[in-house]
Amino acid sequence: MTTPTNRPRTWILPPLPFAAAILGGWWLDRHRWALPLGDGDRLAWLGWLLVAVALLLFAWSLLTLRRHGTTVNPYRGAAALCTDGPFAFSRNPIYLADGFVLSGASLILASAWPLVFAPAVWTAVRYGVIRHEEAHLEATFGEAYRCYRQRVRRWL
């Protein structure tokens, strides 16, 4: 059973700030104040490419977590420290994928609004989620996590 002492004390569900930035940006762009981002037709293909890369990275991350018998759920404790697959080059490949979706959606929508919200999104994820996950991982895996943190960057 997962108790508050053996799981991260995450404040928010990580995809929510990303989704809010995309949906809020779309709504503002269409209903209040357009903030166009170049020629939508020319940039949309790049946006779809970013979303495709994000989906592949997300799937690879999920498969790696599953292979190690641990969870993607930010409200549950980690059962294993994943240091291979996408976790060999990023400590947060799922949030990196979320960032690719945010950027891709901005290009697909041809709206700069999601990118305007990006600093607030990254701040919310950094302090509302990652800080708590990292504290949990260090408390759970100790020196193994500290070595991993020294070896692998947070993003890329």
Regions found by a protein language model. Give the residues of each.
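Membrane-anchoring alpha-helices and their flanking helix-loop junctions
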Residues: M1-D84, L96-L156
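Solvent-exposed interhelical
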Residues: F87
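Extended, alpha-helix-rich binding/interface surfaces that flank or overlap catalytic cores
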Residues: N92
